[in-house]
Structure formats: structure tokens, C-alpha cells
A protein has these predicted regions:
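Glycine-rich phosphate/pyrophosphate-binding beta-alpha loops
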Residues: 35-41
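C-terminal helix-cap and adjacent tail motif
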Residues: 5-13, 85, 183-222
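Small-aliphatic-rich amphipathic alpha-helix that forms the alpha element of a beta-alpha
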Residues: 29-33, 114-120, 127-174
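Short catalytic-loop micro-motif centered on adjacent basic/acidic residues
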Residues: 15-16, 46, 158-162
Length: 222
């Protein structure tokens, strides 16, 4: 596929046909995705390929509490799991909220699941002392995760970068024998999408880019 077409049509695929993602195709996807950049080219990214139905079912079970909170906050008009605005949703509200299947089923309905982790010993977390949640570490892992989806799209497959499993990181680490210095960055289900979307809804450049400062004039061309 042409690069811009791939970028504009790679979406969060959660419904799959059941077609197999062979090891050969998966290897090709990862072989190309590995060229993503990382801080200092230290390449702290690691991947565990999961086909075992029992382990995939366990992932789906482990994300349920995070999915319930995500859904309850969304229904309350809050930004789910945001670290800025304190939630008004009670633990009772969260417990009473059923997790939507779209947040749990992809782990078992996809053909394969990738557990993407990053070695925090080699990541430059330059924002670690700021009074906010850290985001900089992601610069050394999420380009790789996105490359996986771009390569999957090129091969006719799709998936989505899910992060709910991070809320159960100790359990995920135990399930896959992951050392504690590795952070669970994403769990990516992969399969052939039931429907390939071609027109994605995204903000126009003028609504997300400004000139010179945050509240500057919108960036655009005549």
C-alpha cells in the first residue's frame, strides 16, 4: 500500500473474521515494525506472542475491572482514567457497570495477541520528577506498537493498541513471567477485520495545530 493510504486507513480493529494470522505473516509484520525509533536507539521493546486460548481468556478477565471503570466514567461524562480531574464515580457505580464486550472480547476473538512491554532500565523518563503522570517513556515504545498496526494493515490485517491490562500489570507480569522492570505498554489483538474502514474521523489540522504558541493562530494554508 502507499504510505499515506496506510496511515489514513489504519483504525482500531476489534471485530475479526476468524482468518488466521500465520507465524510467517506475523514475523513479517514484526520484522518491519522493529525499525521504529526509540530513545538512544536502546530498543527496550519486547513482545510476547500469545496464541494459548487459556492465557488470552485470562487477559480478558484481568482487564474487566479497568473496563468497568472506563465505562462508568464515560457514562458519567468524565474522561475515563484521566489523571487531572478527580472522578465523581463511586466504587459502587463502577462495580455495578457491566464491561462492554468491545473492551474484553478482542483478546479471545482475534487470532493472536501481542503483549508489548518496555524495559524501564533503558528508557529516559525525563518527566519522572514532574508533578503529573509520566508520558515521556512512551516515546520509546509506542512508535513500535503503531508500526505493528501499520504493518498489519499493509498485510490485510488489523488490531488495536489496548492499555487496560496495564491496570493489572502485576498479574500480567506473573501470567507471562515478565520481570518487574518491564512495563506493560500495550496488549495488541490482531486478526483480519470484518470490515476495513477507509474514512476515519479525525480533527482537521486547523483544530489541533497553532502557530508559535498554544493559543496562537490556527495553522493552515490558503
Amino acid at each position: 500500500m502507499e504510505l499515506y493510504d496506510t496511515m489514513r486507513t489504519t483504525f482500531a480493529a476489534r471485530d475479526y473474521t476468524g482468518d488466521a494470522v500465520s507465524d510467517a505473516v506475523l514475523y513479517k509484520i514484526l520484522e518491519n515494525a522493529r525499525f521504529a525509533p526509540s530513545g538512544g536507539n536502546r530498543q527496550g521493546n519486547r513482545v510476547t506472542v500469545v496464541r494459548d486460548p487459556a492465557k488470552r481468556k485470562r487477559i480478558a478477565e484481568l482487564v474487566v475491572p479497568a473496563a468497568k471503570r472506563y465505562t462508568a466514567q464515560g457514562k458519567a461524562g468524565e474522561g475515563p482514567w484521566n489523571s487531572i480531574s478527580p472522578t465523581m464515580v463511586t466504587p459502587e457505580d463502577i462495580e455495578a457497570t457491566p464491561p462492554p464486550s468491545r473492551l474484553t472480547e478482542p483478546y479471545t476473538s482475534s487470532d493472536v495477541v501481542l503483549v508489548v512491554i518496555v524495559d524501564l532500565k533503558v528508557v529516559a523518563s525525563t518527566d519522572q520528577h514532574l508533578d503529573r503522570v509520566g508520558v515521556i517513556s512512551g516515546a520509546s515504545i509506542y512508535p513500535f506498537a503503531w508500526n505493528i498496526l501499520l504493518a498489519a494493515r499493509h498485510e490485510g490485517f488489523g488490531g488495536t493498541i489496548t492499555t487496560l491490562a496495564a491496570a493489572a500489570e502485576p498479574e500480567i507480569q506473573a501470567l507471562f513471567n515478565i520481570p518487574t522492570e518491564f512495563a506493560v505498554a500495550a496488549v495488541i489483538p490482531l486478526g483480519r477485520p470484518v470490515k476495513q474502514l477507509t474514512k476515519l474521523k479525525r480533527l482537521p489540522v486547523e483544530e489541533m495545530v497553532t502557530r508559535e504558541q498554544f493559543d496562537g493562530e490556527p495553522f493552515g494554508i490558503n
